[in-house]
């Protein structure tokens, strides 16, 4: 199972890197809001809720939930970007980013869980 988690984490991290690289080129013009990280963490929260609700076998959940989605989402980058926004005086953006990340993550995790419970 440990190899499944590691393999899943590598897939998630590569997906995060690709989406972040693309997002920095195409979604960051004219804004200080770290949109790629926000999108990654919100979609990750949704899919984690979905995976949890599906009551997958432990090995599948370890691969998808802990591995892929754990490698895909990023708590450390989120917090680093928040510190950067604060240091650069972007308090308004910081406030909205914080709210969107945590509240949005909780809402989307709940939506994913609800959808998964219907399947």
UniProtKB/Swiss-Prot annotation:
Main location: membrane
Subcellular location: Cell membrane
Gene name for this UniProt entry: fluC2
Name of the protein this chain belongs to: Fluoride-specific ion channel FluC 2
Catalytic reaction equation(s): fluoride(in) = fluoride(out)
Activity regulation text: Na(+) is not transported, but it plays an essential structural role and its presence is essential for fluoride channel function.
UniProt keyword annotations, A-Z: Cell membrane, Ion channel, Ion transport, Membrane, Metal-binding, Sodium, Transmembrane, Transmembrane helix, Transport
Keyword Aminoacyl-tRNA synthetase: no
One Pfam family this sequence matches: CRCB
Domain of life where this protein originates: Bacteria
Disulfide bond entries: none
InterPro entries in the cross-refs: FluC
Source species: Lactobacillus delbrueckii subsp. bulgaricus (strain ATCC 11842 / DSM 20081 / BCRC 10696 / JCM 1002 / NBRC 13953 / NCIMB 11778 / NCTC 12712 / WDCM 00102 / Lb 14)
């Amino acid at each position: 199972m440990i190899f499944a988690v590691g393999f899943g984490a590598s897939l998630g991290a590569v997906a995060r890197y690709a989406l972040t690289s693309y997002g920095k080129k195409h979604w960051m013009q004219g804004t200080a809001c770290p949109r790629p990280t926000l999108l990654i963490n919100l979609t990750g929260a949704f899919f984690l809720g979905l995976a949890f609700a599906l009551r997958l076998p432990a090995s599948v959940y370890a691969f998808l939930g802990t591995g892929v989605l754990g490698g895909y989402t990023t708590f450390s980058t989120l917090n680093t970007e928040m510190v950067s926004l604060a240091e650069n005086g972007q308090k308004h953006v910081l406030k909205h980013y914080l709210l969107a990340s945590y509240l949005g993550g909780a809402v989307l995790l709940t939506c994913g869980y609800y959808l998964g419970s219907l399947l």
